[in-house]
Regions:
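A compositional/biophysical signature of low hydrophobicity enriched in polar/charged and small residues
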Residues: 1-106
């Protein structure tokens, strides 16, 4: 299954909800959400500063993860950025592929 790193920043409304609900309840909600989509929550960390949470998940595919991202964004409670994570073995496979690329202007 593809693995993703999601960086999240709560809006004011989302932060109010987090204060009311608590961190462990939020993690449990994300865990249940991922299971319902056929995925898995691997890690969930809160932070302070520009970003409020770092979440590592496995999802069944990019389409399902995009649907999740759209739904979360539409809630208005949190802003997210999701990064597809690759294993070292996947990079080895990518390095062996021939890609014909012409830089702009060449």
């Amino acid at each position: 299954m593809p693995k993703y790193l999601t960086v999240a920043s709560y809006t004011a409304e989302g932060a109010k909800g987090l204060l009311k609900e608590g961190g462990t309840a939020r993690r449990a909600a994300v865990d249940e959400l991922m299971k319902s989509l056929g995925g898995r929550l691997e890690a969930f960390y809160f932070a302070f500063g520009d970003n409020d949470a770092y979440v590592i998940t496995e999802g069944p595919d990019n389409v399902t993860t995009a649907a999740l991202s759209l739904t979360v964004s539409a809630s208005g409670a949190v802003r997210t950025k999701t990064i597809v994570l690759l294993t070292p073995e996947e990079i080895d496979q990518a390095a062996k592929k021939t890609v014909k690329f012409r830089p702009p202007g060449s």
